[in-house]
Amino acid sequence: MNIKTIGVESFLNDYEHEARLDIAQSTIASLTMGEILELDGQGGATFSDQHNKEKMNYGWIEGSADFKQEVAKLYQHVDPDNVLQMNGGTGANLNAIMAIVEPGCHVVAEYPTYQPLYDLPEALGAEVDHWVIHEEDGWQPRLDELKKLVRPDTRLICVNNASNPLGAVITTDVMEEIVEIAKSVDAWVLCDEVFFPLEEPEKCTSIVDLYDKGVCTNSVSKDYSVPAARCGWTVSNKELADRMRVLRDYTMICSGVFNDTLATYVLRNRERIVERNLNIIRTNREIVNEWMAGEKRASWIPPKGVSVSYMRLDIPQDDESFCLDLLHDTGVLLVPGSRFDLPRGARLGYCAHEEVLREGLATLSAYMHEKYD
């Protein structure tokens, strides 16, 4: 397999530990273990009681019954048996795409967005057409272009809701039209939902609640602020779940007892996490809006209830070298937009802890003005 390096992961692997002010990450301000244990109102007693009686064996190979039940509650019409635990959203995407794509098949993928959604099918031998989204449309997809791209042999349509790094959300009415287009050629639809909107969730519907040949991927990493658990999932119909069961034996076997117990506990306490994270989204988005209003060299399309965003930078320098200079000179970390095929900008992880965001933005402004004005 000839597979490309994931641009954003490569950049973060190389540079994130050098950062003093990390405003590049897409997770909503990661929880500490102490904060996680306080979620149950009993100092973590419910987690400790469950974990302390578990043997440190392989555990439930495809996720415990409790984990599957908690995930199924996130959807309207999901059989818990068709929930499969994966190694984060990354493992979920890998297994889902491998279960659908074959050499020579045709795939349509939203672009630009999270790179594995279009590069993985290509690495597996598919012919991939990019369904390009445009800034002038507020990063919303053009359905007429999707209709032109699908073919009788289209096997899969890949979308990202919300988009990483753009923060654009696909509402239910648009997703329903995507489903109708997929049905017209009997294609699967994979929707990476790790950034599923926390704000106004009634305006969006998971692909698995709209389409039998829909598969969603998700994890506790982004909306639930616990990426350390490395616990994600796929939800699909039984046909695809059975294919992924076979693949899991090659790619992971299991997520591990500790991760399963922790993820189950997090999902059981999701209401408290969502309340916390909605407050972070709203507070920090307003901080960035106010900063943007006074910063002539930056602009953005505000994200809608999700933790990831992209900002344009009006600077006489390519974004890659600028972000490296910024990091080395000030300690502020941004991901260059070119790592997402979005040059002249950067991914802004605006859901960092508030004090980090405020200092990071102030430092960024001072640096740009000193360097260019």
For the regions a protein language model found, what residue spans apply to each?
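Helix C-cap/helix->beta junction micro-motif
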Residues: 124, 184-185, 295, 330, ...
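N-terminal small-domain helix-loop-helix segment of the aminotransferase-like
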Residues: 1-88, 95, 268-269, 371-373
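Active-site PLP attachment segment
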Residues: 210-243
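Conserved glycine-rich beta-strand-loop-beta hairpin in the small C-terminal domain of fold type I
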Residues: 264, 280-289, 299-313
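Active-site phosphate-binding strand-loop segment of PLP-dependent enzymes
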Residues: 135-202
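PLP-dependent enzyme catalytic core of the Aspartate aminotransferase-like
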Residues: 77, 316, 325-334, 340-373
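Structural signature of PLP-dependent enzymes
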Residues: 244-251, 266-289
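Conserved PLP-anchoring active-site segment centered on the Schiff-base-forming lysine
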Residues: 81, 99-121
